[in-house]
């Protein structure tokens, strides 16, 4: 059973004994799964609708207490909620980080004997966890702790390592990867082999072979 995600708004202005509860739901996005995926929002639970796949986690509220922002970590998005009407007003995808670009270097292995910060042909999923809102000069800014997370439970797991993927050797520009000349070398533990990845993305043509990491 995969219950629908929702956000409850509890009003205790009249006292805890007279509390009222309203619920913001995501059911209006059911049937829009492909459109949401095209926008970069991850929906990938087995057989799950959008509302079932969304997993609200941390919440922050604007300075004027009219808007809540909720992290949807596994979905790589933030939901904006109008507090007065208890309505989800928009979904904000956070996108991906291309670690092959200058300025996006990272140390991808803990099995290479030291610190080695460099570019690699992988895309990072931001996946926000805790979240905060700040409003200097009347403009609201959202700050997120992009922790990353994978789903791994009985009956379904997206978690794997680069060494376990069937990579398409024609999809990678080895001329641009210093010291790596083949898929086999790329998948060595001192390179990307031990790097944790999701199996739900990267197989762009659904043939079981991964063109992207």
Q: Can you say where each PLM-predicted feature lies in the sequence?
A:
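Beta-sheet-rich non-transmembrane sensory/scaffold domains
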Residues: 1-213
């Amino acid at each position: 059973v995969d219950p629908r995600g929702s956000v409850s708004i509890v009003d205790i202005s009249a006292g805890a004994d007279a509390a009222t509860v309203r619920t913001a739901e995501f059911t209006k996005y059911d049937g829009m799964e492909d459109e949401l995926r095209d926008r970069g929002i991850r929906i990938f639970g087995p057989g799950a609708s959008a509302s079932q796949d969304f997993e609200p986690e941390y919440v922050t509220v604007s300075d004027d207490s009219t808007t809540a922002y909720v992290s949807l970590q596994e979905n790589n998005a933030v939901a904006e909620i109008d507090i007065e009407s208890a309505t989800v007003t928009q979904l904000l995808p956070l996108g991906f980080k291309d670690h092959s670009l200058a300025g996006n270097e990272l140390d991808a292995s803990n099995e290479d004997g030291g610190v080695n910060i460099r570019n690699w042909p992988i895309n990072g999923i931001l996946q926000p966890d805790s979240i905060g809102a700040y409003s200097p000069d009347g403009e609201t800014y959202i700050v997120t702790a992009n922790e990353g997370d994978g789903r791994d439970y009985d009956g379904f797991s997206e978690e794997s390592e680069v060494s376990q993927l069937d990579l398409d050797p024609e999809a990678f520009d080895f001329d641009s990867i210093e010291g790596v000349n083949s898929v086999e070398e790329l998948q060595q533990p001192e390179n990307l082999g031990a790097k944790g990845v999701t199996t739900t993305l990267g197989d762009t043509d659904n043939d079981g072979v991964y063109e992207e990491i």
